[in-house]
Regions:
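Conserved N-terminal helical subregion
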Residues: 2-10, 22-24, 49-187, 235-236, ...
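Conserved mid-domain beta->alpha element of the FAD-binding
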Residues: 8-29, 33-36, 154-155, 180, ...
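Acidic/histidine metal-binding catalytic segments
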Residues: 71, 120, 256-272, 331-336
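Glycine-rich active-site loop/strand segments that organize a redox cofactor
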Residues: 45-46
Length: 385
């Protein structure tokens, strides 16, 4: 392409930054607008596994695979399943042979940010509205000021995207599942017994219509999610989040009767206890192409986290849009080609995520999880053979 559009990317998450990096490598100028005040303004979330065919592929396209290897935790891919009495039902502690290593979200963001000139990103820009102009371009209106014009506005601004309404009237719907997030700091030194319980990876516990996933992160941190099938506003009514001590006690009370070593994970948690209701767009969400507007990642296809595809799909979106823009003679056709491919590509992971959230906390308890873990282990062994 000899003439590139003026490109605004809304959101400095993995998708937005991956797109900016790939285009920067190709000599295409972009501007990334991020509502956070700076890179460390808030925690970026827990750990995630990057898949060879999506997240890792995107980092290869971005020229950051070696940097990825420096932050990849191949040793933290184990899985254990316990019942509420603390009995170990399944263990796969040799998963470091898998090709989907764990990566902390903050570390991933750091390598992406380090690969870009600082002046590409405009921090503290909270988008309020995208307004079309008479000449076909778009102006951006932020909480404090405006920017533009831009020929192409890419919404990489997450589940509650401010760009999405320009192409779609759909909004994410509550899945029926809510997480309560908690964490344990310096676990190896302060709580070695809990470090041993979790091991090098994650544990799952499910019984009595509720569950818990607890996972090792980097820097000796453990992050946990208590899982409930409840109304969307349940957590804010049931917990006093303004008082971490109260919230911690209330959370432990929800698991009364469970093994002390499981409850100890909650009792040892720090003061960062928050509600995370799970929302998703309809499976097959798509829109009619609108010149100058497109979406990446959760803005396009937010799905439940149970399939582990969210960030991976988002980064592959970025890689594919970047490739189309760099290879196509007409940027408008590039966007159309990206959207057509993306709509089909995300169908399968979205269906799997929807099925997973629908069956989470079923009457079968841990039985479905046990079947899943065994099938995953068998598939990995057959692939290795």
């Amino acid at each position: 392409m000899t003439s590139y559009p003026r490109i605004a990317i809304i959101g400095a998450g993995p998708a937005g930054l991956t797109l900016a990096r790939i285009l920067h490598q190709g000599g295409v100028k972009t501007t990334v607008f991020e509502r956070e005040e700076h890179a460390l303004a808030r925690p970026q979330g827990g750990t995630l596994d990057l898949h060879v065919e999506s997240g890792q592929l995107a980092l290869r396209h971005a020229g950051l695979y070696e940097e990825f290897l420096q932050i990849a935790r191949y040793e933290d891919q184990g899985s254990r399943l316990y019942d509420k009495n603390g009995t170990l039902l399944f263990a796969d502690d040799e998963a470091d042979e898998s090709d989907r290593p764990e990566v902390d979200r903050t570390a991933l963001r750091e390598i992406l940010l380090a690969s870009l000139p600082a002046d590409i990103i405009r921090w503290n820009h909270d988008l309020r509205e995208v307004c079309p102009r008479d000449d076909g371009a778009y102006d951006l209106f932020f909480e404090h000021g405006t920017a533009g014009p831009f020929d192409l506005v890419v919404g990489a601004d997450g589940s509650w995207s401010k760009v999405r309404p320009l192409v779609s009237h759909y909004r994410p719907q509550y899945s029926g599942i809510s997480f309560i997030e908690f964490g344990i700091d310096d676990v190896d030194a302060s709580h070695p017994e809990l470090a041993a319980l979790v091991g090098r990876g994650k544990i799952s516990v499910e019984a009595d219509g509720r569950g818990m996933i607890v996972q090792r992160n980097g820097n000796a941190h453990i992050r946990g999610y208590a899982i409930f099938r409840v109304p969307a506003d349940w957590a804010n009514k049931a917990f006093d989040f303004a008082s971490p001590a109260s919230a911690r006690a209330q959370l432990a009370a929800e698991f009364e009767g469970w093994a002390p070593k499981i409850l100890a994970l909650i009792h040892a948690s720090n003061d960062h206890i928050v509600s995370r209701p799970i929302y998703a767009l309809p499976v097959g969400h798509r829109w009619q192409n609108r010149i100058g507007i497109t979406l990446l990642g959760d803005a396009a296809h937010v799905m439940s986290p149970f399939g582990g595809e969210g960030v991976n799909a988002a980064m592959l979106d970025a890689a594919e849009l970047g490739r189309q823009l760099l290879e196509n003679d007409d940027w408008r056709n590039a966007v159309r080609a990206y959207e057509a491919e993306m709509f089909e590509r995300v169908m399968e992971p979205a269906e799997h995520a929807a099925e997973a959230v629908a069956t989470e906390l079923s009457h079968l308890g841990a039985e479905l999880s046990l079947q899943h873990y065994k099938a995953h282990l068998e598939a990995r062994h057959s692939t290795a053979a």
